[in-house]
Amino acid sequence: MRLQYKTTTKYLFFSLPFYLMLFACGLQITDVEYALREAGENRGELEAVLSHYAKLDDRQKLEAAQYLIRYMPYHTSYDKGIEDYYHAIDSVVALSEDKLEQEKHIESLRLRFESKYKQKRDIEVITSEFLIQSIDEAFKQWRECEWAEHLDFEQFCEYLLPYKCFEGQPLTEWRNAYYDICKGDIDLAYLCDEYKRNPIFAATEVNNQMKNTPQSFGLLKTLPIYDPDIILKLPFSNCATYCLGAVLIMRSKGIPVAYDFTPNWSTGNNGHSWNTVYTTRFGNLEFAPHTTDPGTVHYPYLKVPKIFRNVYKPNEEYLKIATEKYIPPKLRNMFIRDVTAEYMPTIDIRIPLQESLKSGQSPFIAIYDGNNWTPVYWGKIAGSHVVFERMGLNTCYIALAYDSNGNAIPI
């Protein structure tokens, strides 16, 4: 995580910001020119995508292409060498049904393949053919698939449009590759008025198929895995990995599913991840893949200070902090959106500053995890106060400032 953070920060420091006004089919695309310059020698591939949709006179597809390109400079992906690691795991699982034996060999593979995991900036390697195909497939899901037709354009851009679901995911044709995994009878939903156009049915049907795969929760040390077929074969894994697999499986079918998480429970030393499906009437309904279905309240007896959703668009507040100041390791993820208020009543916590923060210091709010004070969100300076927005209730907090070396100072 620290290495990835430094790399991202380097790009933010040395890519000088500028604003150039361009118009394509009457659309203002200021930030797109910044992205095109960041593409370097790959600029022609991205311009080909914009030109393609401008000639088609499809305003929405052109806007979608601009959306993806605008934020692409911040994204990186593993190259296809990652697939050798997947094949090795598949071979290990096929050789033995003993989960402990599988664990031993899978963890040994991590050390063997770690040096082969190479990340590249999407903006520098993505091809026009791949991006056009991905955009067209996403629009087909939105315009023709019953599970997604209730999404507006902004929601479509968040749930279905992105050419990948997670940071690091290789640039592959994942929708077609994963469509048949755990699909159950969703293709027959058109036969029943209660099921067609019902994303709750679709997510539940797929989740029921996932429940039929033998999953166990535990600590298995692996390199990042973005292939749900491999995830389903692991002897055991954690909630984050299973939720990642669920997003890939369900979005490949046009089901608007997201990955939500809390960095830390209010009274515990761990965070947690789960999924949500965006419904036609009830907004987002959470569920745990392999375990519970949409509409089942997830851990209602546990308090959370903050809940985030994994998204494609980088968090602007995060970027402002990351370019100049220290961010604690647990919060080093720019691709998040605060959705705490979707789950519970929240409060803006306003704390007076006894003295101004020094240059390079940034405010964070933390909870006690039983051992240490763990930061869960950043704050904003408002005059002589610091404000922490949309915080969960019934939680004990402390306000901290971090200097550039990562030292915490109570405010």
Language model region names:
Residues 347-355:
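A short, amphipathic beta-strand motif
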Residues 356-372:
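Short, ordered, surface-exposed loop/turn motifs in non-cytosolic proteins
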Residues 31-33, 54-55, 189-209, 218-229, ...:
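Hydrophobic/aromatic-rich core segments of domains that either
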Residues 385-405:
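Short Pro-Gly-centered beta-turn/loop motif in secreted/extracellular proteins
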Residues 48, 59-234:
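Secondary-structure boundary elements
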Residues 371-385:
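Short, acidic Ser/Thr/Gly-rich low-complexity loop/linker segments typical of extracellular
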Residues 405-411:
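Edge beta-strands of extracellular beta-sandwich domains
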